[in-house]
A protein has these predicted regions:
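Macrodomain-like recognition of ADP-ribose-binding/processing modules
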Residues: 1-182
Length: 182
């Protein structure tokens, strides 16, 4: 069996060299603020058009859903958009916010994508931000513990996961929670 190899980095998620970079998005796939705004600035404006086309095909996304588009960037091929915030019609107030269950669902959906993507690849490299910890207001420690539990399992493909903490303090929290992994 193979597993996930964890690398922890501090800095700008979009400067990572990877096959796939995860975008903390929303159910309307709008490149708005936070990580999504960074995608908007880093990738060509064609990214939003591609996201709009994916949403047309999907009709409606739920929190935790994952969709892929071309990245339109030089340092990674695929942008994997995770619906973290719920901006669907009729959703108000706190109902827009993610829960830890949203993160668990998202990780399972990311893994399904990785499994299919890895079929004809030696190794896959994915960069991941702290989903739900910006506008979503989830506690970083809680999300990182979910990551640790999820990524410490064996899987049938070879994948390096780059966990990116934007600030020094984020990096330190990730490092301290992950440091006892082999």
């Amino acid at each position: 069996m193979m597993g996930y190899k964890i690398t922890i980095k501090q800095g700008n998620l979009l400067e990572c060299e990877a096959d796939i970079i995860v975008n903390a998005s929303n159910t309307k796939l709008l490149l708005g603020s936070g990580v999504s705004m960074a995608f908007k600035r880093h990738c060509d404006k064609a990214l939003q058009e591609a996201m709009n086309n994916v949403l047309k095909d999907a009709k409606e996304l739920r929190q935790g859903d994952v969709v892929a588009t071309k990245s339109y960037a030089k340092n990674f091929q695929i942008a994997l958009h995770v619906a973290v915030m719920n901006y669907n019609k009729g959703v108000k107030g706190l109902q827009k916010m993610p829960t830890l269950k949203t993160i668990e669902i998202a990780l399972k959906n990311i893994e399904q994508f990785l499994k299919a993507y890895a079929k004809n690849k030696q190794k896959v490299k994915i960069a991941l931000p702290l989903l739900g910890c910006g506008i979503g207001a989830l506690q970083k420690e809680d999300v990182i513990r979910i990551y640790k539990n999820f990524f410490s399992r064996d899987v049938a493909f070879d994948c390096e996961v780059i966990l990116v903490g934007y600030r020094d303090e984020d990096y330190n929290i990730i490092y301290n929670i992950f440091r006892d992994l082999p």
